[in-house]
């Protein structure tokens, strides 16, 4: 079994979990900034990424966001996180997330295929992600 893992470390407490990513499609790649969001059920990409890769929709999907219900385009991509974790044939939707300065919003569709842990020990945030899941994380006194 191949285990893919990375840990992102910050020098201070972070309220946004950000890391580098590469979006691939049809042999083309784009460097991207990804933000992790446990409140998002699905992964989204910015309209800028759609344009840069010349992506064509594979269909439409009805989604509910904090700002309402909408219909969005679906796309098929490969996603590489921190040059370590590769997720192939990922169905994503486009979104206006580029307004937030990010290119990819990582949702629970990705988080749920592995183990995801966040720590803020000694005033420094770090988070780790690995696939496939290797076990539960439990905290004890």
Locate the predicted segments by residue:
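Pepsin/retropepsin-fold aspartyl endopeptidases
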Residues: 1-141
């Amino acid at each position: 079994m191949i285990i893919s893992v990375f840990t992102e470390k910050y020098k201070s407490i972070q309220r946004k979990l950000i890391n580098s990513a590469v979006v691939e499609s049809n042999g083309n790649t784009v460097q991207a900034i990804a933000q992790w969001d446990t409140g998002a059920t699905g992964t989204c990409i910015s309209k800028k990424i759609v344009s840069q890769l010349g992506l064509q929709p594979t269909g439409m999907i009805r989604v509910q966001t904090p700002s309402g219900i909408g219909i969005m385009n679906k796309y098929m991509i490969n996603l590489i996180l921190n040059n370590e974790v590769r997720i192939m044939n990922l169905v994503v939707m486009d979104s206006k997330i580029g307004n937030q300065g990010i290119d990819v919003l990582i949702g629970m569709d990705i988080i749920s295929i592995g183990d995801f842990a966040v720590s803020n020990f000694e005033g420094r945030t770090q988070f780790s992600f690995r696939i496939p899941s290797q076990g539960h994380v439990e905290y004890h006194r």
